């Protein structure tokens, strides 16, 4: 697995190809926008029908990342559930899967715009979290602080040898990191368009996910 190491406020962080962020010194794995229950919410609203397997796929990738890092703490950066009802209607096997992953580690749910209410799923529920100089919350702010967030589902499009590729990506500048969506069924916003273009500093880079991480200046995105 080819990851990408970088530093924010003298803290070494690791962007993983899956879209997870690993903080080795603190043994913290951070993921954002899992959006459990999206297919069931769309079905309830009669908007669309997509195969109801996204939870299992997302949980399997998360379990793989937890196993590979042996993380002692996990931070879910908001929109872990597609709505508040989704957190109450997970199938029993998926609830047990989450419970199994929570065993022996600290688990923190950060509130998001899709899931602002506490969950009865174990772990802690917070609106934000500060660890040292790093501030974890769902949506990036305009404050001049070192910040880890999600929400926007950033993606990047590049043209290589005449072929167009679109992938989820991390966005990184000297003050902040915006994580890609980790959930299976999620759309995204192009990193070189507003509001992301306005949020990130001019020298920001995108870390394109896939089988390995590719760093690309946002200015080079198509």
Summary of predicted features, one role per range:
Residues 1-77, 81-222:
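Extended recognition/assembly regions associated with phosphoester-bond processing machinery
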